[in-house]
């Protein structure tokens, strides 16, 4: 297999049906390719969150700076509606099909190909590494965080990182991510007293109090945004009383909502606001809050500049520096080093007939190679 061409490696990875938490041999395929290029590969296993998860850390070189590429080989289930086999990795009309082609086995293969091309000119300056997890699409408790802990215990550090998520909405070169909004989920349960709907004065209906709480939470914007972040949002995701009867006032009323928040807030500050707002409505209310990630921003600098210039040279487009979208494993890496996200076009990720353009794969390989030349060119 020629590693300077990203397509064969991408096909080999896609043919491993690595639906979270299964690895299905994907990391062995990747490690084999990296070992042929001279990388030292380490397999890190963890099972604190359930089934054992396999992760891979591979490094070429021992000196600083250490430029890392982070990604994942696990994929979401294929689901229904495919017109091709989801793990066959077939090519049709210049498009590589398969679950994980966009998110994100294609980008992993592109980075490996970029490294292979760089090595044709000699050993890189400093070190190159790959941090690849099998637990990004799942709970994300046994993946990237565990590898970062393992690195810290060894005294190894990453100096900057590219995450190969499919950041481009329409065309390669559209967008890179320099941060992400945080995400908070809240479940409210308002307690009352059940009773007959003909005698409401003998019951304590929790529904009006729940509606009052939701009105208080949603009546004003959380903020107006910042130069790099859109305004924070609160989206109601469920309202439920679990009451099929038409003549019974329920004893409980429940609601759930999700907040996507910018760097004007933290999970802790939003939880305080929620609890203070709920308290104003009175009554007995249970509040459960889960923060799956804090907001973060990597200010524009050497890494984003190198990526933007490389993308412009290859595609003619200057990527928008964005913080939109959901969370990614960059939320863990940002505690260790500057991190940006840039990969293939994400229009079909998680959809049936997921695919990427073979031409885009060649272009992304060249973008990554030019970034490596700027930041890690052989002396």
UniProtKB/Swiss-Prot annotation:
Cofactor: Zn(2+); Co(2+)
Transmembrane segments: none
Pathway recorded for this protein: Amino-acid biosynthesis; L-lysine biosynthesis via DAP pathway; LL-2,6-diaminopimelate from (S)-tetrahydrodipicolinate (succinylase route): step 3/3
Annotated positions binding Zn(2+) 1: 72, 103, 165
The protein's Enzyme Commission number: 3.5.1.18
UniProt enzyme class: hydrolase
Known catalytic reactions: N-succinyl-(2S,6S)-2,6-diaminopimelate + H2O = (2S,6S)-2,6-diaminopimelate + succinate
GO MF annotation list: acetylornithine deacetylase activity; cobalt ion binding; succinyl-diaminopimelate desuccinylase activity; zinc ion binding
Entry keyword set: Amino-acid biosynthesis, Cobalt, Diaminopimelate biosynthesis, Hydrolase, Lysine biosynthesis, Metal-binding, Zinc
CDD domains: M20_DapE_proteobac (cd03891)
Subunit structure of this chain's protein: Homodimer.
InterPro entries, per the entry: Bact_exopeptidase_dim_dom, DapE_proteobac, Peptidase_M20, Peptidase_M20_dimer, Peptidase_M20A
Binding-site residues, Zn(2+) 2: 103, 137, 350
Described purpose of this protein according to its UniProt entry: Catalyzes the hydrolysis of N-succinyl-L,L-diaminopimelic acid (SDAP), forming succinate and LL-2,6-diaminopimelate (DAP), an intermediate involved in the bacterial biosynthesis of lysine and meso-diaminopimelic acid, an essential component of bacterial cell walls.
Protein family (similarity comment): Belongs to the peptidase M20A family. DapE subfamily.
Gene3D superfamilies in the record: Zn peptidases
Active site, per annotation: 74, 136
Cofactor note: Binds 2 Zn(2+) or Co(2+) ions per subunit.
Biological-process GO terms, alphabetical: diaminopimelate biosynthetic process; L-arginine biosynthetic process; lysine biosynthetic process via diaminopimelate
Matching Pfam families: M20_dimer, Peptidase_M20
Organism of provenance: Paramagnetospirillum magneticum (strain ATCC 700264 / AMB-1) (Magnetospirillum magneticum)
Stated name of the protein: Succinyl-diaminopimelate desuccinylase
